[in-house]
Swiss-Prot record:
GO terms for molecular function: DNA binding; DNA-binding transcription factor activity. The gene is yidZ. Belongs to the LysR transcriptional regulatory family. Keywords: DNA-binding, Transcription, Transcription regulation. It holds the Pfam family LysR_substrate. This is HTH-type transcriptional regulator YidZ. The keyword Cell cycle does not apply. CDD domains: PBP2_Nitroaromatics_like. It comes from Salmonella heidelberg (strain SL476). Residues 8-65 form the HTH lysR-type domain. InterPro entries: LysR-type_TF (IPR050389), LysR_subst-bd (IPR005119), Tscrpt_reg_HTH_LysR (IPR000847), Tscrpt_reg_YidZ (IPR023746), WH-like_DNA-bd_sf (IPR036388), WH_DNA-bd_sf (IPR036390), YidZ_PBP2 (IPR037402).
Length: 319
């Protein structure tokens, strides 16, 4: 008997499309920002609706049934038409449209020119406000003062900046992971020595004040080893620390994300990079997942969805 569309939750079709794309309940759940259990329940409802397994488990992931394969293109077309319909009022370049971003610098400086061009091309009358990521940026997202944040979090188990500790109201997407490097002036005396932990700790360090803290996971790892670095200078951000590390007349060294190589090239800073002198297990604790963050209420806001996609594409191209 033919079933009525009115009795089907249309969100199930989005779930079906993501399952077809990812061939994995876990990966589809991650893209939908729900639990794998929720996706499994949705799949059960879809199987009942279509009276077909739709997918079968294989060692390589979910394999679509013949019925699912036959529906793939129609489903994709239907979703595309739905997105175009929902985007229609936002594609009319409304007056007063405003983008509010909070981002880590120099990451935003690397990509902002390209991003702003894309925004103005799509929304010619839009205005853009960018603020530096700070200790209160998550609260600003929650209050609706910031549309989207773009910043690094931490991986050390004791860090207060783990992704798992984000407020429940915040959704996120990790765009890339970065292992920080040590940056030294190209004539720094450390470059004439064996590069090891003793050399790394022998010289004074530039640190940044990050969310009201002068220390980060690097200092936690050193503490676990019974060691400590001498922080001689604290600055507001990475661009200032890199600029100071490049200046003559001192032996200061800076630790900053690896992506900063693009910033250094852009500004022709005379810096040389060295890896952090730790073993693989210690480096794992120092990985920085660079992450887009937004409030759950904006998860399906066409403006925010488009902005996330634009930043994602730029990161893949530039970083």
């Amino acid at each position: 008997m033919k079933k009525s569309l009115t009795s089907l939750d249309l969100n199930l079709l989005l779930c079906l499309q993501l399952l077809m794309q990812e061939r994995s309940v876990t990966k589809a759940a991650k893209r939908m920002n729900v639990t794998p259990s929720a996706v499994s329940k949705s799949l059960a409802k879809l199987r009942a609706w279509f009276d077909d397994p739709l997918f079968v488990n294989t060692p390589l992931g979910l394999a679509p049934t013949p019925l699912m394969v036959s529906m793939e293109q129609s489903l994709a077309d239907w979703m595309q038409m739905g997105n175009q319909l929902l985007d229609k009022p936002h594609h009319q370049t409304p007056r007063g449209l405003k983008f509010e971003l909070a981002a880590e610098s120099p990451l935003m400086m690397i990509m902002f020119n390209s991003l702003s061009q894309q925004i103005y091309q799509r929304y010619p009358q839009a205005t853009i406000k960018v603020r530096n990521w700070d200790y209160d940026s998550l609260e600003a997202i929650t209050r609706g003062e910031v549309d989207i944040g773009f910043t690094g979090r931490e991986s050390h188990p004791r860090s207060r900046e783990l992704l798992s500790l984000l407020p429940l109201a915040i959704d996120f997407e990790v765009l890339f992971s970065d292992l920080p490097w040590v940056w030294l002036r190209e004539d720094h005396p450390a470059l004439r020595e064996a590069w090891d932990l003793d050399t790394f700790l022998r010289y004074p360090h530039i640190s940044i004040c990050w969310e009201q803290s002068d220390t980060w996971a690097l200092d936690d790892v050193l503490q676990e080893m019974g060691r400590k670095r001498h922080i001689a200078l604290s600055l507001p951000g990475f661009e200032q620390s890199l600029f100071m590390a490049a200046q003559p007349g001192h032996t200061l060294i800076a630790t900053a994300p690896r992506y900063c190589q693009h910033y250094n090239q852009l500004h022709q800073l005379p810096l040389v990079a060295r890896p952090l002198p730790f073993d693989a297990q210690q480096r794992e604790k120092l990985m920085v997942p660079f992450t887009l963050l937004w409030h759950k209420r904006n998860s399906h806001n066409p403006k925010i969805v488009w902005l996330r996609q634009a930043i994602n594409t730029l990161c893949r191209r530039l970083i």
